[in-house]
Amino acid sequence: MNNSENNATPWLFEITPKNKFFSLNLTEVWQYRDLLLLFVKRDIVTVYKQTVLGPLWYLIQPLFTAITFTIIFNNLAGINTGTVPPFLFNLAGITVWNYFTACLMGTSNTFGANAGIFGKVYFPRIIVPISIVISNLLKFGIQFGIFIAFYVFYYFQGAAISLNGLVVFFPLLIIVMGILGLGLGMFISSLVTKYRDFSHLIGFGVQLLMYVSAVVYPMALVKEKMPEYAWLVQYNPLAYIIETTRYMLLNVGHISFWGL
């Protein structure tokens, strides 16, 4: 009887979330914009602090990756990129892919890496992952500048490359990539706080995801060579974004509004 009476006793206080799960108070984020800028500056300064080459690593990583992919996938495996130079083809995909992975990897450990700050002072928690996405725009801008430099070089070398008229919408693709990295990274971060195994799987999973995201090959090649596995790429929104990037910047491939 006593147990049933205790269970029936109503709570004096009930703590409930102020907003719904998917509700974002962007007005509050704007009110803390100065703090957001401080986090952005922190992310930029601390990445390569006390390193010899510093920001040059922004250039080294995509260049050597593009060279390696060109040797392995184009020269050895014989993947055809049409009239576009293989190095430029790979560099276009790698530049956009690097921005996504930087946002994903940076936000996937948000709650764990900033637990001390979260417990000391109140501010909108969404500010930290947003600052990571914004700071990675600087890295993307530098790498995209390298792509433009090689684009101009190949153009004056007589390569059959040209911009597509839809290139004006290219910034929207970058915004979409940032949002995807932010959303998926925050979801993984919430899992990592409870299941530590995810922290070991995220790097391996990103590597596997790259190979089904059409970073180093055209999507049409999968349908031609391995049609039974084409669904792995066709149902991957990242593959359509990267394919659309090459369509806009190199005028090669195709664009699928359904995939986007």
Model-derived features: where do they sit?
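Hydrophobic transmembrane alpha-helices and immediately adjacent juxtamembrane helices
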Residues: 1-260
